[in-house]
Amino acid sequence: MSRNELDERIETYYVRVRGVVQGVGFRHATVREAHALKLRGWVANLEDGSVEAMIQGPGAQIDRMLAWLRHGPPAARVTEVTFEERHVERRFERFQQQ
C-alpha cells in the first residue's frame, strides 16, 4: 500500500465535550487514552468549562476514542459530546494536552 493510500485512511475529527470535565483530570486521561489507541492530535480546556479536542487516526480507533469520551475518567460527568469530521492537510505528530 502506498503512502498516499495510507494517508487517505486517516480521519480527523473535532470534538467538544460538555459537563463536569474540567478540574477532574479529563485532559490528562484523554491523552493517556489517545496514546493507548495510537491516535494523534490535541485536547484543551475552553473558557466555557467544556473541553475540545482534535483527534486524528484510523476510523476504528477514532470510534473507540469517541466512545471513551462519552464517559471520560471516573471523576468526570459528561453530559454531551459533539463531533464533526474535519478535512485537514496537517498530520499531527503525537497527541498532546494544550
Curated annotation (Swiss-Prot):
<feature type="active site">
    <location>
        <position position="45"/>
    </location>
</feature>
<dbReference type="InterPro" id="IPR017968">
    <property type="entry name" value="Acylphosphatase_CS"/>
</dbReference>
<dbReference type="InterPro" id="IPR020456">
    <property type="entry name" value="Acylphosphatase"/>
</dbReference>
<protein>
    <recommendedName>
        <fullName>Acylphosphatase</fullName>
        <ecNumber>3.6.1.7</ecNumber>
    </recommendedName>
</protein>
<dbReference type="InterPro" id="IPR036046">
    <property type="entry name" value="Acylphosphatase-like_dom_sf"/>
</dbReference>
<keyword id="KW-0378">Hydrolase</keyword>
<feature type="domain" description="Acylphosphatase-like">
    <location>
        <begin position="12"/>
        <end position="98"/>
    </location>
</feature>
<dbReference type="InterPro" id="IPR001792">
    <property type="entry name" value="Acylphosphatase-like_dom"/>
</dbReference>
<feature type="active site">
    <location>
        <position position="27"/>
    </location>
</feature>
<dbReference type="Pfam" id="PF00708">
    <property type="entry name" value="Acylphosphatase"/>
</dbReference>
<comment type="similarity">
    <text>Belongs to the acylphosphatase family.</text>
</comment>
<dbReference type="GO" id="GO:0003998">
    <property type="term" value="F:acylphosphatase activity"/>
</dbReference>
